[in-house]
Every structure is written in C-alpha cells, then in structure tokens.
C-alpha cells in the first residue's frame, strides 16, 4: 500500500527543538501565561498548530522566500499562510487550494465544505471540547448522501469506550472497523487531524497518531463535504494542503 511517509518518519520529529518564531513539535509546547501551551483562543487545544501531521518535518527549507513546505505563518515571503487567528492576505500559499478555516464557537452539527474534494496531502483539523455527559461524536466525509469515511468515537457502548469507522454507500453501511484506543475525555479539549493519503486516511488526536482507514471510495474528488456532529463544543474547523 502506497504511503507518502512512514508512521515512524511522521512521529520521529517529536524530540527536535522548536524552530524560532513558530510553535515547536506537538507535545513540546512551552506553557503560555494563563492558558494552554500555544493556545490561540479560548477552547483551542494545547499547542494547536495547523499545517503539519504529528511529528512531520516540513519538506522544504526554513522558511526562505517562497520555500516550498515552509510552516504556515512564517515571514518567508508573499503568499505564506497568516499566523493562527490572523486574516488571510492576497496570494494564498502555493498548493493551498482551497484553504478554509472557521473559528468558533461553531454550531453543531456543522458542515465544512471541501471544494474540489479531498486529495493526498490535504490536512483537516478539528478543534473542540467534549461536553459533560457526552455519548458520541462523529466526523463524516461525504459524497452526496454516501459517507466515504465515518469516524465515530462512542463514550458508552455497552459500558465501553470505542471508536467505530465505516463507509456508507446507497444507505448501506459496510464492515465496521473498531479501535479500542480512546484518547477523548469528558469535558476536555481535543484536536482531531485527518491527513489524506493516496490509499488511506490517517487520523491523529491530541498530537498522536491514532488510526489509519483505507479508502473504500476511490474517487476522492467526489468527497466534498465534512459533517461534524455529536456532543461537542466546536471551536474551529479547517483544511489546508501540506
């Protein structure tokens, strides 16, 4: 199965010191006064840093003019992403077509448009907080009424916590894939990142790789909407190319 980078490579950067001017690798954020490390707004997950899968180093130089793959928000030249929370300017970052970021609180359920569908190296980031007495939450990558990728953490299924992944075509659900590793906590903030690869979705939660789900729908360009639902307070939803 093809893969743009191995999981070991993706997670190998966690011990490197942070680059100047941008938050360091996830999990190594210095604490900011009065808030979570790296939190840019109330409800942001600790160390919220869009634009990189956990531990992934930027593929290009840092961050010279027009450097391909430079971290978003760096003063490397025109067209770079703005810093988190700042408005975008003219000349979007090359390859970031499209980039969408909505800062909350957002209504739930919430639909995030994915114009042009999903594609390899697209990174979707969802930030929020699990509500007290939560039962479930769900991400649904949709093609019309079909669901290409259903990501469904369940907090109490027969007194167990489990994550269920599946695909729905013509109103018929396929074979469930279940994950017992459960990184979500009642009342706690979370960050979900979904990285699209040629053959699969990678999912990371709270800065750590969680699971991989092989594509069951092969035409990725038809997957043009992400539905977010469940017992959460939704702070932000965004997508970008990395």
UniProtKB/Swiss-Prot annotation:
Region (Disordered): 1-35, 55-93
Biased composition (Low complexity): 17-31, 80-93
Record bears the keyword Acetylation: yes
Keyword Oxidoreductase: no
Segments carrying motif Nuclear export signal: 218-233
CDD domains xref list: GLECT
SUPFAM superfamilies, per the entry: Concanavalin A-like lectins/glucanases
The protein's role, per its UniProt record: Galactose-specific lectin which binds IgE. May mediate with the alpha-3, beta-1 integrin the stimulation by CSPG4 of endothelial cells migration. Together with DMBT1, required for terminal differentiation of columnar epithelial cells during early embryogenesis. In the nucleus: acts as a pre-mRNA splicing factor. Involved in acute inflammatory responses including neutrophil activation and adhesion, chemoattraction of monocytes macrophages, opsonization of apoptotic neutrophils, and activation of mast cells.
Protein's name according to its UniProt entry: Galectin-3
Lineage of producing organism: Eukaryota, Metazoa, Chordata, Craniata, Vertebrata
